[in-house]
């Protein structure tokens, strides 16, 4: 336990001088004496001076204060005691419900599992959300990205996924709120409480108003808790909202440390930082981590370096579209843009594959015909195309679904649709079994039987 003293403070960056033979390692956690602040070593500048990032506010700190090296990285509580609790980046409880009472703490910087320990699998994870199960099915132990601009429903989709998976699969989840709104974190906590699934979720928050150090490390804190559950032999879910803010915090820290920026002002280590996080989110022979990550897309530009770097790591991408949201179709998932590695007849079966591809073909053809319809009207289309357009509009509406977590806003009860029902409904529409029903009957219903019932009332 060596000690040093603060020699410089610039915002969240603090330089600390140690005896030359006792300089802390990079990523060691330092504690400021007489303050609650923890610092993390980022660079060794020479002459016994290390440059650190503060994991919290630097208000009230001054030069000359004593700093103690803990000798290890930041460590956080892991295990069942974390379930139902809200913690910050350092693992301290922030829900005013007393100490965590953990039996074990792990450091947040860990090596990814080796090749020999990793395990692949093709088992599907049913979500109960029609458009996702049909067009971009999730793999157990896979990584999923929810891509979308501001206000198209990333967080609502994520809340619905957590609720459905906790209720239907009774697994443990870890939710890392990275640089998002505190109000959303609060809503999320109460939503989980009302759904009676809070005792299966560990919550870690580093919200928008916190210093960049907190936002950069909070994803690792959540991941460490998930790794513990995985190593105990469980199938655990890790939700990260929002991975873009993780990148953004990295950009801020990089600038504070004086590194040269790269494209669009991002940090030069963008790919490496993303890789360090993503490579740890993997399944081993003991258990699996299935990860769902919300990805904010700046200015709806998917070629921005941050979403583009994230794409490379994912097994499935769910793209939320502003155009679909503007039609009032929620979840606003774009079935033509969203993809999954699992969409393979050898994995999901021929019937599911044919139905998904059939739906995509009909919607793509409808998209092509829209220009003709806009200029010449429906009457100029062939009978075959008229029929296709009618089915496409039904499919488009049938892809919508009332959510449990949005009941308060929509006034209609949420629906969980099993995969078999989803396939039956869409293949029926493609085969023309429901050509006689009006398209309004398919809007905001669960299974196809509900659409038939709704049609009787129209």
Swiss-Prot record:
Organism superkingdom: Bacteria
Enzyme Commission (EC) number: 7.1.2.2
One GO cellular component term: proton-transporting ATP synthase complex
Topology of this chain in the membrane: Peripheral membrane protein
Keywords of this entry: ATP synthesis, ATP-binding, Cell inner membrane, Cell membrane, CF(1), Hydrogen ion transport, Ion transport, Membrane, Nucleotide-binding, Translocase, Transport
Reaction catalyzed: ATP + H2O + 4 H(+)(in) = ADP + phosphate + 5 H(+)(out)
InterPro entries: AAA+_ATPase, ATP-synt_VA_C, ATP_synth_F1_bsu, ATPase_a/bsu_AS, ATPase_alpha/beta_chains, ATPase_F1/V1/A1_a/bsu_N, ATPase_F1/V1/A1_a/bsu_N_sf, ATPase_F1/V1/A1_a/bsu_nucl-bd
Primary residence: membrane
Family annotation (SMART domains): AAA (SM00382)
Keyword rRNA processing in annotation: no
Annotated positions binding ATP: 148-155
SUPFAM superfamilies named among the record's database cross-references: C-terminal domain of alpha and beta subunits of F1 ATP synthase, N-terminal domain of alpha and beta subunits of F1 ATP synthase, P-loop containing nucleoside triphosphate hydrolases
UniProt entry tagged with the keyword Transcription: no
Gene3D superfamilies in alphabetical order: 2.40.10.170, Bovine Mitochondrial F1-atpase, Atp Synthase Beta Chain, Chain D, domain 3, P-loop containing nucleotide triphosphate hydrolases
A Pfam family matched in the record: ATP-synt_VA_C
Family: Belongs to the ATPase alpha/beta chains family.
Subunit field text: F-type ATPases have 2 components, CF(1) - the catalytic core - and CF(0) - the membrane proton channel. CF(1) has five subunits: alpha(3), beta(3), gamma(1), delta(1), epsilon(1). CF(0) has three main subunits: a(1), b(2) and c(9-12). The alpha and beta chains form an alternating ring which encloses part of the gamma chain. CF(1) is attached to CF(0) by a central stalk formed by the gamma and epsilon chains, while a peripheral stalk is formed by the delta and b chains.
Function comment: Produces ATP from ADP in the presence of a proton gradient across the membrane. The catalytic sites are hosted primarily by the beta subunits.
Listed name of the protein: ATP synthase subunit beta
């Amino acid at each position: 336990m060596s000690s040093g003293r603060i020699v410089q403070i610039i915002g969240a960056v603090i330089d600390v001088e140690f005896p030359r033979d006792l300089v802390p390692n990079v990523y060691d956690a330092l504690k400021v004496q007489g303050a609650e602040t923890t610092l993390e070593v980022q660079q060794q500048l020479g002459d016994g001076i290390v440059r650190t990032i503060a994991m919290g506010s630097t208000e009230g700190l001054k030069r000359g204060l004593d700093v103690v090296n803990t000798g290890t990285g930041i460590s956080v509580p892991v295990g069942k005691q974390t379930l139902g609790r809200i913690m910050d980046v350092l693992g301290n409880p922030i829900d005013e419900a007393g100490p965590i009472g953990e039996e074990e703490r792990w450091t947040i910087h860990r090596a990814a599992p080796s090749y020999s320990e990793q395990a692949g699998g093709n088992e599907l994870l049913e979500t109960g959300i029609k458009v996702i199960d049909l067009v971009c099915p999730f793999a157990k132990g896979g990584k999923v990205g929810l891509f979308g601009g501001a206000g198209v429903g990333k967080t609502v989709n994520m809340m619905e996924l957590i609720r459905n998976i906790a209720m239907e699969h009774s697994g443990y989840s870890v939710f890392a709120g990275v640089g998002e709104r505190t109000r959303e974190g609060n809503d999320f906590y109460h939503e989980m409480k009302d759904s009676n699934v809070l005792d299966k979720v560990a919550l870690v928050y580093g919200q928008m108003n916190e210093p960049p150090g907190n936002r950069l490390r909070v994803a690792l804190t959540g991941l460490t808790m998930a790794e513990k559950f995985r190593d105990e032999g469980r199938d655990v879910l890790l939700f990260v909202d929002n991975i873009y803010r993780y990148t953004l915090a990295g950009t801020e820290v990089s600038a504070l440390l004086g590194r040269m920026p790269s494209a669009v002002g991002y940090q030069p280590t963008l790919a490496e930082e993303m890789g360090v996080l993503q490579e740890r989110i993997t399944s081993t022979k003991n258990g699996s981590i299935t990860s769902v990550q919300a990805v904010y897309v700046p200015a709806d530009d998917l070629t921005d370096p941050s979403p583009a770097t994230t794409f490379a790591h994912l097994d499935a991408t769910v793209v939320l579209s502003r155009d679909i949201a503007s039609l009032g179709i929620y979840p606003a998932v774009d079935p033509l843009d969203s993809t999954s590695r699992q969409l393979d007849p050898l994995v999901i079966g021929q019937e599911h594959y044919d139905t998904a591809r059939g739906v995509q073909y009909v919607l793509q053809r409808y998209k092509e015909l829209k220009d003709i319809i806009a200029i010449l009207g429906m009457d100029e289309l062939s009978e075959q195309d008229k029929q296709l357009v009618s089915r496409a509009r039904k499919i488009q509406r049938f892809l919508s679904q009332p959510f449990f977590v949005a009941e308060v806003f929509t006034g209609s009860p949420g629906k969980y649709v099993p995969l078999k029902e989803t396939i039956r409904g869409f293949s029926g529409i493609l085969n023309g079994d429901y050509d006689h029903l009006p398209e309004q009957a398919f809007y905001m219903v669960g299974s196809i039987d509900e659409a038939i019932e709704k049609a009787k009332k129209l």
